[in-house]
Every structure is written in C-alpha cells, then in structure tokens.
Amino acid sequence: MEKKAFIPLLYLTSIVFLPWWVSFSFNKSLGSWIINWWNTSKSETFLNDIQEKSILEKLIEFEELFLLDEMIKEYPETHLQKFRIGIHKETIQLIKMHNADRIDTILHFSTNIICFVILSGYSFLVNEELFILNSWVQEFIYNLSDTIKALSILLLTDLCIGFHSPHGWELMISSFYKDFGFAHNDQIISGLVSTFPVIFDTIFKYWIFRYLNRVSPSLVVIYHSMND
C-alpha cells in the first residue's frame, strides 16, 4: 500500500522538477557553446524589423550626441577618425547583443519543446499513476465544504478574469512571446489581453450552468451570494 502511494508522489515530483532540471542542464551545457559558435562562425545576422529599428535608433542617437559635441568643441580630423571607429565598435556590440537575445530565444524554445515531449511521454506511459493522482485530487475537492469550494472558485475567477487580471495576462503573454521567439507587438498583446479574459469568463459561466447546477446546486447558491 505504501509503495502504491509512493509511486504517484514520485511521479508528481518528477512532473514538477524534471522539466526545470532539463531546461537548466540544457542551458548550462550548450548555452556558452552556441553563443561562441554564433558569434564566430555565423556570417549572417538574423534581425527582425523591430530589432533593426532599435539598432538604428541607438546608432542615430549616438551620432547625434557626437555631432552636437563636435559643433561645440570643434574636434580635429583625428578625433573624427576615432568617432568612425567608435561607431563601428558600437554597431558590432549592438549586433552581438541582439544575437545573444536571439540565441536565448532559441534555447528557450528548444527547452520548451523538450519539456513538452517529456510531459507528453509521461501522460502516455504512466496512465495508472495519473489516474491515482486524479482520484486523489477529486477526493480532496469532494471533502471540502461548499463554502470553501465557492471561496476557491471566486478567488480563481478574480485572478483570471477579475478587474486586475489584465496585468497578469499581459505579463504571461509577453513571456510566451519571448520564449517562443515572436517579435514583441503591443497591438497583438493588447488584443489578446482584452480577448482571453472574456473567453474564459464565457467558458466558466457555461461550466457553472451545465455542471455545477446539476452536481451541487447549493454550491452555486453560495457562490452567487459571495459574488453579489
């Protein structure tokens, strides 16, 4: 009996920590090697439109500051030569910085794929342990009082679709964009932030109407009383 209880707990622990360990090991073992290879062997620089615009803006700002300083102090030709060298070094530094961001995106994307494969394999290979965990969760929820259940549902809905939820959605979607290598786009993110809470609110109300009203009408009454 103890062995049967230990195996699902081990499975749950591996679900939580194994993807994190794989991600950490992958970044530590291959991160520095990929950065070195990219900066020494890669002749082509991969920049999207937003990155190119950012680099150009920084270079233009650097040039404008120098030209303003030159107009005030009237530097000789030798200083102008140093300025051109400085512009060249600044350009290389900016490109390396953006390439490092791109490499970081590739590493994040690769580790996300690996973690997804691991979790998918777990779900197919250990159905029995997953069934036991599911039964434990259902039993735990069933033993809670209707008041605690209603309070938990109210807290969860306020976090996901409440007044302050757009800030959390914005952080989560921005993190998703960064991990999977998409260019940051404020318009798309704003559209998703304004759409997702509405979709989840609709799904949640449908779930209350179809499931909770049939399974536990008293829970629905308590929930509506708290919500009002």
From Swiss-Prot:
GO annotation (BP), single: potassium ion transport
MF terms (GO), sorted A to Z: antiporter activity; proton transmembrane transporter activity
Keyword tags: Antiport, Chloroplast, Hydrogen ion transport, Ion transport, Membrane, Plastid, Plastid inner membrane, Potassium, Potassium transport, Transmembrane, Transmembrane helix, Transport
Compartments in which it is found: Plastid, Chloroplast inner membrane
Annotated signal sequence range: none
GO cellular component: chloroplast inner membrane
Membrane topology, as annotated: Multi-pass membrane protein
Reactions the enzyme catalyzes: K(+)(in) + H(+)(out) = K(+)(out) + H(+)(in)
Matching InterPro entries: CemA
Pfam families: CemA
Residues passing through the membrane, by range: 6-26, 113-133, 188-208
Family according to the record: Belongs to the CemA family.
Function: Contributes to K(+)/H(+) antiport activity by supporting proton efflux to control proton extrusion and homeostasis in chloroplasts in a light-dependent manner to modulate photosynthesis. Prevents excessive induction of non-photochemical quenching (NPQ) under continuous-light conditions. Indirectly promotes efficient inorganic carbon uptake into chloroplasts.
Protein name: Potassium/proton antiporter CemA
